[in-house]
Structures are given as structure tokens and as C-alpha cells.
Design a protein with these regions (language model features):
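Residues forming the flavin
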Residues: 1-8, 12-717
Length: 717
């Protein structure tokens, strides 16, 4: 019935396709002649001998995902008419074991030289079908995939006839390329038996410990003066209310003691070269001004170096806000973040140090730990794999001016609340109003402060853990301040984790008041410094004007300020919001599109501590596989230079984003040479080459031209 409908159509495009089908035998004859020069050109850069193409086409139903939107039998009959097609079949689930068996049997029985599978996205199942092709006895790179699901049936599910015709086009294009595909062979490169973890928060520490436990030398690079990250600033963790430092400090100590971990604090990645298995990373160890015992010993100072006694800090006359305490407590120009730092090593802030020399005198002639003339040091390390665990920053909530942060003293962020309520914080764990030091008895928590914000000022995404830590804060004030009432202004309470919903019920039972509605404005009473919170209660459908003593903003989180620079160094993509982009959100959440580079923690997107640690362990496991194997295979999608055409202009060398190209002297002239292990097959060089001297393996110019012809000319030459 589908064929009859097509015969009666009056559309020009439909008539064109029908005419193409009628002339199939003629096309077959022309096609046999046409590939001769193309095959010769493709084979020029070291591929296999030309042979007559015998292509097998396999059409997947994908249940009803594909078959429900198009006429599979009509598509199958059309595929039989295409030049070079020797076999056509269809199956309900081609990716299943029986489906792959269909491919294998057909290849062997019909002596096929290439395979085209018409199914879903190659991003999902290309490796599956490539393996099936290889097991059937064909070079796996003689496989081509036609996407007739994501790019067809799913978007044309209500246009059965149009979807059917589009599937025919997709298969015709894929067959045209498959007829010209050549044997390609992966390259094997050795892997350096070391790894690097960038960022030493809880994710980076866990990843480094797992790698070290697997016997892998690990360089742990942290830009701050000590390890621990954001978790070291927290008082308690939800929903178990464990002391954050109590569960984090042992892990920090383990990192400091691990012989297989080279801990590099106050250090940043400066440059990256190389590829999976052979990354050459240059790190910049910032001038610290204080010697470690090992550094002192290397200078001949026996028994010297910093021991964390604090004598230097006591005499330092320079005072500035302490970043670890979110500016609510002072620190000196020579300082440590907190008493439990790892490594226990003071740091001089040379931006504020006046070099008075008092710290040198206080340190004494025995330790000689102070070096006021120290300079930045650049160190090169070679590693096989890399894990990025760079963490996050707090969204500058002062940008949302309606909430009065940094205008009103008694409007604070959740991180400031954490330090105020923490026993090691600036107030010794006593929650007080910044304006007058009084204990607040009515506290408003504003959730989604900057999150789920489509105004263009805040962030459109959910920061995931704000709801839960605000519930934790509500518990802490009811526990520490009898009679204090927490008011929680929320949009939705997202208690998604294990025991989170139960924790939510517990906070309700403890007396917290919940008002569903976004806070529109906060104003201060200039006399009392109390705050009026204005919102709409969407459950009771009435406006709210609530006077409170303190407002806590659950500020959104965002990628760290240097995330963009770091990701570019390692060739990692990012999302629209700046979070590092995983290779696949479901199937490869720890990997990236750059082989050998993995992600862990919040740098990939907002997540709580359990999810962060779990991803860190997954990233460590993935990063250890190439190292333990000792070598890796690189897919042969490399640029290839046709030296007879190369003019040695060097344009491609300057354009290559991966530094994979160079000019070399050959037969008295310069020609382009590819470092195949660095090449990602992006095609930039080939697109810009003025002489057409660069082709991409598996995407050679004749193959692309054949696809274009198949689409525009219906396969006619």
C-alpha cells in the first residue's frame, strides 16, 4: 500500500524519488564505474587494496520506536535497489544478541565487505555494531550507521509517509559512504603508570586515595593552601548530622600520609601537552614563603622547616579578612586556614606581606623555615590519566539586589551561617546577628536564592543540596537556641536522597514553619535592624510580610572561577552553565570526550557529598584501567597528509587545537606530519587546507562527496 501511495503522489520530490527507484538497474551500472577513481584516492594514504563493494543493510525496528513511525518493509524493499547492496534484512532489536547474530550470519553467508545498520544514534550503539562487524570477519571500520530514530522516527512520529521517505534517504547516503570505506587499524600507545587529580576537596581526595590504593603514583594538585575543599567549612552533614570535620579530617590525614600520593598544595596547572597515556603537565607551585621539612633538609638545614607552631603568625602585624571564615574573622599575612589543615604548613600572602622580617626572627635559627625571597616554581610531571575535581564557588548573591545581601548586616548566606554555627568558627558556634551580636529568635531561610532563576541574573538550574542543608540549619537553631523559630521560604523541597524525606518530616515535627513562595523583597527597619520579608504564600494564596531577626540565603552554586581555563588546558567541553561536560550523562558520567580525562564531584554539576564520593570512586576506577593495562588503543580517526599535494604552507599547523601537526623536511621540501596520538580527527586542518592535501580517516573527501551526491542526486552520478 505504501508503494502504491507513492506512485500516485503529485509532489515533485516524491516523483523524483520514484524515478530514482525505477532507474535502479542503470544506477547500479554507473555506480560500478564511478568508485574507481574515488577508491584510488581514498587508498592513497596507506589503506587496503580496492575490492568490489558488497554492502549489507540491516534495519532495526527498535520495538515501536522506529517501526511505529515508518513502513519498514517499504524501506527494506527500497534498500535492495541501491547500488552495491548485496543483502537487506530487518529485526525487532538489532542491538540484541540475536540481532547481532543476524548481522554475523549475513556477512559470512553473503561475503559482505561492509555493513550499514539503520537504527538509533551511533553515540549509543556504534561500538556494539562495530564489534559485531569485527566478529563476523570484517574490519570494524567498514561499518556505517544510519540514524533513523533520533533524527527521523522520533521527530516525525505523526508523518509515517515522510518518515519512510527520510529513512530511505538516510540509508542511501550511508550505503554510498560504506561502499568507499577502507580498512583502518587502531594505534596502540603505552601508558605512563601515574595519574593526576586536580582539586583536593572530598572528591579529589577520595579519587587520589583510591588510585594510590591501586598502586598508582598520584599527583594531587590543589590551588588552595590546604586540602579539604568546601566540606572542611561545614559544621554538620545531612541527614545524619555527623560532624563534618570529624569524618573529613581522617581522610585528609590519610592523604597526607599516603606514600603513593605526591601532595601539591598551593599549586595550579599551568600547561598541558600530550594525550591519553602520555600527558605532560606543567604545574606552577606558587611561592609560599615557608619551607617544608623536606625542603629545609634539601638546603642543608637539619631539623629545620615549618612544624606549624604558629610563632610567626603571633608576631605578624598585618591583618586582613580570613577567606576560609568568609571574611567574618581576621587572619595575618602569614597564616593557616584552620587548626586541622593538611599539610600543617604556614603560607605567606605576598600580596599583603610588608616583609618586616618579624616572622623570620620568631621562627628562629633552628627551623629557618621562612624564605621571604621565594619564587614561583614550575614543575613538569608525566601522567597517563587525569581526574578533574575542581569543585564549585558560591553565586554572588548580591547580584539579586532585592534580598539586600551586603546592604543589610543581618542578611547572610548559608556558608556564612555554617561558619557562625560551627564550634571552630568566628563566634565559637554561637549564632548571633552580625549587626549587634544578639541571639536571633526568628530566622528566615530563603531557598533557591539564585537557583531556578530565569531572570537572567541567577542560575536556571537547581543547586540540588540547598533544600537539605537549609533543613539541617533549621534543626541546628532549634537545637542550640530554645524558642527560636525557623521560617523556610521554599518553592519545592527536593529531598531526593536516602533518608532525606524522613529528615524533612523530622524538621517539620521540630517546629519549623514552611511557607511556599518565592521571596520578592527584603527591607530593613533602620532602627531595630530587623528585616521584613515579603513573599506570596502560594498554598494559602495570600501575601506575607514577616518580620525576622536574621535572613539566611541559600545561595546558588556555580563553577569555580578558573574552571573554564582548566577545562581548556585539558580539552574538556562544558555545558551552557559552565559545568564540565561528561562523555554521556547516563552511560559514561565520569568520562569526557578527551580520552584519559575524567570528572569527579561538583565540577560536573551540583551534587551532594554521597554522590560526589561515589563519582570520585567511579572516576578513580575508570582512570586506573588504562594504567593497569599498560597500553591503550586509539581510534584511527586521524588526519592524513597526501604529501604530493602538500605545499608546506603550515596553515594547518597553526590551526590545530591539539598541537598534533608539524612541518618536517622530506625530500628537500617541507610537508605536514601528524602526531596520530594527539590528533582527535576534528577536521579543522582538512577544512582549511588550500590544496586539499589533508584527508580524515573514515571521513575522506571522496566519501563525503559520495554522501552529498547520494542525497542531492538520489545516488545518480
Amino acid at each position: 500500500m505504501m508503494v502504491e501511495k507513492k506512485k500516485t503522489t503529485t509532489k515533485k520530490t516524491e516523483t523524483k524519488k520514484q524515478d530514482t527507484k525505477k532507474e535502479a538497474p542503470v544506477k547500479q551500472e554507473v555506480k560500478k564505474q564511478a568508485p574507481a577513481p574515488a577508491a584510488k584516492a581514498v587508498a592513497a594514504p596507506g589503506t587496503t587494496t580496492k575490492q568490489e563493494a558488497r554492502i549489507g543493510v540491516f534495519i532495526c525496528h527498535c520495538g515501536t520506536n522506529i517501526a511505529g513511525s515508518m513502513d519498514i518493509p517499504a524501506v527494506q524493499e527500497y534498500a535492495k535497489t541501491l547500488p552495491n547492496v548485496a543483502y537487506v534484512d530487518n529485526y525487532k532489536y538489532m542491538c540484541s544478541m540475536p540481532g547481532q547474530a543476524v548481522i554475523s550470519k549475513a556477512v559470512k553467508d553473503n561475503h559482505l565487505t561492509g555493513v550499514v545498520v539503520s537504527a538509533c544514534s551511533p553515540r549509543l550503539h556504534e561500538p556494539t555494531f562495530r564489534t559485531a562487524t569485527k566478529e563476523a570477519g570484517i574490519n570494524p571500520f567498514r561499518f556505517e550507521m544510519a540514524n533513523i530514530r533520533e533524527q527521523n522516527s522520533w521527530v516525525h512520529m505523526h508523518d509515517r509517509e515522510g518518515s519512510t521517505e527520510k529513512a530511505k534517504d538516510a540509508i542511501r547516503i550511508a550505503v554510498a559512504k560504506a561502499a568507499l570505506l577502507q580498512d583502518l587499524f587502531p594505534k596502540t600507545v603505552p601508558v605512563e603508570k601515574a595519574a593526576m587529580v586536580v582539586g583536593a576537596g572530598v572528591a579529589g581526595m577520595q579519587a587520589a586515595l583510591d588510585l594510590a590504593a591501586a598502586g598508582i603514583k598520584t599527583y594531587l594538585v590543589e590551588s588552595d593552601t590546604s586540602i579539604g575543599g568546601r566540606m572542611s567549612q561545614l559544621d554538620k552533614t545531612f541527614p545524619t548530622l555527623d560532624c563534618s570535620q570529624c569524618i573529613l579530617t581522617p581522610k585528609m590525614v590519610d592523604v597526607g600520609r599516603a606514600t603513593m600520593i605526591d601532595l601539591m598544595t598551593y599549586t595550579e596547572v599551568d600547561a598541558v601537552e600530550g594525550y591519553i597515556g602520555n600527558f605532560d603537565v606543567t604545574v606552577r607551585k606558587k611561592a609560599r614563603g615557608v619551607l617544608t621539612p623536606a625542603e629545609a633538609e634539601a638546603r642543608g638545614i637539619v631539623g629545620g622547616g615549618c612544624n606549624g607552631c604558629g610563632d610567626c603568625e603571633a608576631v605578624c602585624p598585618v591583618i586582613k579578612p580570613n577567606e576560609f571564615e568568609v571574611g567574618m574573622k581576621p587572619r595575618k599575612a602569614i597564616y593557616i586556614n584552620h587548626p586541622q589543615v593538611v599539610p600543617l604548613l604556614y603560607t605567606i600572602d605576598f600580596n599583603t606581606c610588608i616583609k618586616c622580617g618579624l616572622c623570620v626572627t620568631a621562627c628562629g635559627p633552628e627551623k629557618k623555615a621562612i624564605d621571604l625571597e621565594s619564587k614561583d616554581e614550575f614543575v613538569k610531571v608525566k601522567v597517563g590519566t587525569v581526574i578533574l575535581a575542581t569543585g564549585y564557588d558560591i553565586f554572588p548573591i548580591e547580584n539579586k539586589q532585592e534580598w539586600g545581601y551586603k546592604r543589610y548586616d543581618n542578611v547572610i548566606t548559608s556558608l556564612e551561617f555554617e561558619r557562625l554555627i560551627c564550634a571552630s568558627g568566628p563566634t565559637g558556634g554561637h549564632l548571633v546577628r552580625p549587626s549587634d551580636g544578639e541571639t536571633p529568635m526568628r530566622v528566615a531561610f530563603v531557598l533557591c536564592a539564585g537557583s531556578r532563576d530565569n531572570t537572567g541574573i541567577g542560575k536556571p538550574y537547581c543547586s540540588r543540596f540547598c533544600c537539605m542543608y537549609s533543613l539541617k540549619h533549621a534543626h541546628q537553631i532549634t537545637e542550640k537556641i530554645p524558642g527560636c523559630i525557623p521560617y523556610i521560604f521554599y518553592m519545592d523541597i527536593r529531598s531526593f536522597g536516602k533518608a532525606y524525606e524522613e529528615f524533612y518530616y523530622r524538621i517539620q515535627d521540630e517546629g519549623a514553619k514552611f511557607i511556599r513562595g518565592r521571596v520578592a523583597n527584603i527591607l530593613e527597619d533602620p532602627k531595630t535592624k530587623n528585616l521584613h520579608v515579603y513573599a506570596d504564600d502560594t498554598l494559602l494564596d495570600r501575601p506575607v510580610d514577616m518580620e525576622v531577626d536574621l535572613v539566611v540565603l541559600a545561595a546558588a552554586i556555580q563553577p569555580k572561577v578558573d574552571t573554564n581555563r582548566t577545562r581548556k588546558l585539558f580539552g574538556v567541553s562544558c555545558s551552557q552553565d559552565g559545568w564540565l561536560l561528561e562523555a554521556h550523562p547516563k552511560l559514561n558520567p565520569c568520562g569526557t570526550t578527551t580520552a584519559g580525562v575524567f570528572l569527579a564531584g561538583v565540577c560536573q554539576g551540583p551534587k551532594d557529598i554521597p554522590d560526589t564520593v561515589a563519582q570520585a570512586e567511579g572516576a578513580a576506577s575508570a582512570a586506573s584501567i588504562p594504567i593497569h593495562k599498560g597500553e591503550v588503543e586509539l581510534e584511527p580517526y586521524f588526519a592524513t597528509c597526501i604529501e604530493e599535494k602538500c605545499a608546506g604552507c603550515g596553515m594547518c599547523v597553526n590551526l590545530c587545537p591539539y598541537s598534533a601537526l608539524s612541518l618536517v623536511e622530506k625530500d628537500g621540501r617541507q610537508v605536514m606530519q601528524v602526531t596520530e596520538a594527539k590528533c582527535k580527527g576534528c577536521g579543522t586542518c582538512g577544512g582549511f587546507c588550500p590544496g586539499g592535501a589533508i584527508w580524515m580517516n573514515h571521513f575522506a573527501t571522496p566519501q563525503i562527496v559520495a554522501q552529498i551526491d547520494a542525497f542531492l542526486l538520489g545516488g545518480e552520478q
